[in-house]
Amino acid sequence: MTQRESLSVVLITLNAAAQLEPCLQSVGFADEIVVVDSGSSDATLELAARHGARVVQQDWLGFGPQKQFAVGQAANDWVLCLDADERVTPELRAAIASALQAPACGAYRFARRNRFLGRYLRHGEGYPDWNLRLFDRHQARWSDDMVHEHVLAQGAVATLDGDLLHDSAETIAAYLGKQNRYTSLAAEAAFAAGKRASGAKLLLSPLVRFVKFYALRRGFLDGLPGFIHTVIGCFNSFSKYAKMIELQRKETRS
């Protein structure tokens, strides 16, 4: 039998002790685990060491640059990039092992299933949330985006069976606080890139998003959690464009 490609799992962390252990337990099949930490003050580092991870300290660079830095710390060319609140299912683990036996391409994506209000969403924006996370670092890399980062692959991308579970286990207040930070970063990045918002985008973007994810992708089948998840996503669109308009007005006044 052909020996499979060696695999490094890489994570970025900051005070992730509450979620980290299930993640590390799910990737015990990897040849190496690398945790790049940006200054945790909780038990994150102790948990990582307990599971045999190699810990690297790096001040925060932004989501894309931080994840690419983590990829660069891996000992192996094939990397699986995860967040601390994610878990690899047995089905996905088997699919990854099979793919690495004889890789057909340099990058693989798979579905992520998001848990919201204690329920794994099966429709709408919550599933399938396609993520490209397994790749040969010579054939793909993380974008330089400070937020909404994504992997840029040079060639074909294949799809694996099995789900990645996203267990954020947050309160609504914490979730909204995170979304507020993300929309601020997204607005600043779009503005810096020369993009401009308008009243039409401010009004239409949330409506289009609601129709797409709640109606067309049947988010309504996820009950009240699906409705709340969709509405918050729509408000994120509204918030991003509102913040861009604020930046535009500041530019005009200056």
Pin down the residues of each PLM region.
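Conserved donor nucleotide-binding strand/loop of the catalytic core
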Residues: 45-73
